[in-house]
């Protein structure tokens, strides 16, 4: 059986990337960290001249993410997916690509004040994104597990996720939360 997919889903500045790196550090097998942000940085939003261009770039980023995930899913690596997707159809399409593996959907959250504080220290984030995203219904779903990064360090969150995966083994297709 191939290793699991752990999907880290939450608003900007919640700590998904830090959590993914901590998960890699204690992974039982080599783990790929695939983040939507890696594709988003291929374009600069300020260069977009219309809402249509922004939307076209967003869909291209999501398609590129799914294309890479489709290749990695055929490997023997564990997959750590770092997503801020709010569009339900894009999220479901992405999860569907991963559906041949045991999958765990982990909500990564923190109080809005913590998100805003973290956001203020990031050069790659505009102000207000954390507040807007924290109230989005996309992040109020039934997750397999929720990690509050205001009360868990990345290492502590990674241990909690690893314990959950070990205590709730899955084979093949994901839970009803995923695809």
Predicted regions and their residues:
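Pre-Walker A (Motif I) flank of P-loop NTPase domains
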Residues: 2-5, 77
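Hydrophobic anchor at the beta1->P-loop junction of P-loop NTPases
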Residues: 8
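Walker A (P-loop) phosphate-binding loop of P-loop NTPases
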Residues: 13
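Conserved lysine of the Walker
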Residues: 16
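Conserved substrate/cofactor phosphate-moiety recognition/catalytic segment
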Residues: 21-64
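Glycine-rich phosphate-binding loop used to anchor ATP phosphates in small-molecule kinases
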Residues: 57-102, 109
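Conserved phosphate-donor/acceptor-positioning beta-strand/loop module used by diverse small-molecule
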Residues: 99-120, 147
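Small-molecule kinase domains that catalyze NTP-dependent phosphoryl transfer to phosphate-bearing small molecules
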Residues: 118-162, 167-179
């Amino acid at each position: 059986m191939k290793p699991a997919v752990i999907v880290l889903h939450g608003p900007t500045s919640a700590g998904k990337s830090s959590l993914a790196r901590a998960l890699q550090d204690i992974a039982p097998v080599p783990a790929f960290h695939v983040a939507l942000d890696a594709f988003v940085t291929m374009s600069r939003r300020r260069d977009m001249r219309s809402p249509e261009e922004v939307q076209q770039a967003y869909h291209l980023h999501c398609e590129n993410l799914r294309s890479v995930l489709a290749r990695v899913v055929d490997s023997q690596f564990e997959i750590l997916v770092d997503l801020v997707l709010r569009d339900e159809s894009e999220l479901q399409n992405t999860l569907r690509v991963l559906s041949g593996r045991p999958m765990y959907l982990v909500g990564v959250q923190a109080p809005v004040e913590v998100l805003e504080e973290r956001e203020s220290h990031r050069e790659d984030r505009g102000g207000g994104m954390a507040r807007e995203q924290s109230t989005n219904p996309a992040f109020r779903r039934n997750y397999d597990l929720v990690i509050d990064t205001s009360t868990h360090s990345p290492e502590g969150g990674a241990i909690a996720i690893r314990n959950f995966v070990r205590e709730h083994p899955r084979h093949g297709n994901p839970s009803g939360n995923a695809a």
